[in-house]
Amino acid sequence: MKFYKILNKQIYISENYSIVPIRFQDKFKIMKWRNEQIYHLRQSKPLSEEDQENYFSNTINNLFNQKQPAQLLFSFLKSNICIGYGGLVNINWNDKNAEISFIMNTELEEKEFELNWLIFLKLIEDLAFNEIMLNKVYVYAFDLRPHLYRVLELGDYFLDARLKSHCKYEKKFIDVVIYSKIK
């Protein structure tokens, strides 16, 4: 397992769920899920295996030794099986805030969406607020999944902003919503 130089604690656990520094063995599962869920991601085209290899080799591999990486990514495990991934992205070390990114195995979305999101949020917030001492975390989302907002509100997030007609989606402009939590 790789380790993030910046973190004292690498693994966060809640019952049989955990987040661990992103595992290279999960890269093709992650690619599959991203391609299946491209509609709500800031990803312009499906990823190829070559794209994914390059991203892991050239971007992710370099994050582990950085003093202040722009992102901290984790494999989300249930009983040591990867069922999702995410982390803190667009980390602003000066202003002490970061965006939370998370996707899960597409097959789990229908029945375990709320559960997996809430557990992931609990784990990543522990890291964000208690390990790297951020003041604020937020979720940036295309206004396409209202069921996500309910989950965020259950996790004590508040609607921080609505960016009107902010992104083009299927030939029309849609809003972006930002849900935040302050330490």
Predicted regions and their residues:
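Generic structural signal for secondary-structure transition and capping sites
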Residues: 27, 38-39, 64, 133
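Acyl-donor (CoA/ACP) binding surface of acyl/acetyltransferases
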Residues: 1-27, 77-183
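Short, conserved alpha-helical segments within structured domains
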Residues: 47-51, 72, 144
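Short Gly/aromatic-enriched secondary-structure transition segments
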Residues: 34-35
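Sparse recognition of residues in long alpha-helices and their boundaries
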Residues: 46-47, 68, 168
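Hydrophobic pocket/interface hotspot
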Residues: 30, 52, 100
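Conserved GNAT-fold acetyl-CoA-binding loop/helix
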Residues: 38-60
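A short helix-loop-beta-strand connector motif used in the catalytic cores of GNAT acetyltransferases and
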Residues: 59-75
